[in-house]
């Protein structure tokens, strides 16, 4: 009996080789082979109590999509070889992604890409090559050329079990408001994506789901900005300068784009900048930033949470942890409301050159904080906290199609002395269902403890092993009494890796390990340690240096090692200046508004 292709796991054993041989008079003339997998994939767009669904089902099982948007991995296509492809998809698996969106503003990926996604169980959202502008579909020659392209790509890719959906375009409907004097383009955009394209696809591929564009509503230009139908691109945070908690106000059915910029790794910056360029608004840094006011926006958001750092290099660290916090908060919010929301695909996964951007993986292969964070917040079995000024609720999130028995521990701790109170509970989770383990009111805690020096730690334990620890603080770091933490790192050289055990005396916020000798990832990074706690991290050997050299290159720090400018007026002045720039005011008006649900 053939095995069905699944997700959340490697599917190598579920792939089969199909061969076709052309013969004449018992002589072989030609042969073709393809690797295929058996599965059903559906995109459920039916009405439900929340509006109109946008939910993928794999073999009949609802999926919460944890994905990212893939841009061209290099500005020069031929520089992207098979080794880089494997590293790229290794990073996607490390981040616990189950879908990559091949963005329509780039180019169609190679056969090797789709083969590798098939092997890894990574689903692919495939945009056609139309994005962000008007196309002259009304010209017969152009339309016939487009149809030829569509048939060629569909025929090439439709056998891949990783292919989950054909998407007509990226954000073209979103651009229509600027096409006042281009009504012919508007009319033909609707005609092509809503009437012409899908029948052309069905000639080659009768089964794979199709959606006219992203974002999409219920019809052309109907509900494109609505949360209760279709998929959404949410840019209230970042472009709209909304606070990072803004996403908790949005109960979208499926968020296929949302993002936040950060600086790349220091090793990446040294590839394109010299010491005299190390300033966020230097000519070189402005050149390597393609978002208007992007570097200033990073400062704007860093200052909302931290004091501003005195050293340039600490902007890398703080921009990356701020990016991770933003994407994690949104993804966990939507995962907690699985069923109403069915997917979170952050923008963007990778870079095509050395740049400050929305990516979790920089051009040179260095993992940003978001890569490590995604491994945690996208884990198929994970813990999440929904917190407010009034209460907090501890959730266990289960995306696995099997019952899970887990123990959830919650601990209130003092930043210096450690445990204040602790409780644990055993839970039996049904397949692909979430559960609330604890709910607590904040008022009694405020009376009992000084919350400026108190944190909440939640642990998820299964079969005696701690799968995950999550820390929640009750205010922004700049308002808390975070102590100076002394970190001790023990480095052990093993056969093919380093083992690093980090221990702290007091609460250590956002412990960061880095190496100047390798871009290979640590097994974990940017984590918190409670007073007296230790955590062991591994780093694989790099063929370009010895393990001894690698060990000597390791540097460890936490938030308490960052020297800050603690002048609140300085930070406030910077935030006001960023907000009042004309481009940011316009974006704030456009992107900051809450959606209005469309009536069905």
Describe the function of each predicted region:
Residues 1, 392-429, 434-439, 454-461, ...:
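Beta-strand-rich binding/interaction modules
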Residues 1-6, 11:
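Single conserved hydrophobic/aromatic residue that forms the stacking wall/gate
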Residues 19, 27-133, 143-165, 286-324:
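Active-site-adjacent substrate/metal-binding segments within catalytic domains
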Residues 50-55, 375-408, 477-504:
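Surface beta-strand/loop "capping" patches
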Residues 166, 199-202, 211-214, 218-229, ...:
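Substrate-binding clefts and catalytic carboxylate motifs of secreted carbohydrate-active enzymes
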Residues 434-438, 525-527, 533-537:
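Short strand-edge motifs at loop-to-beta-strand transitions and within beta-strands
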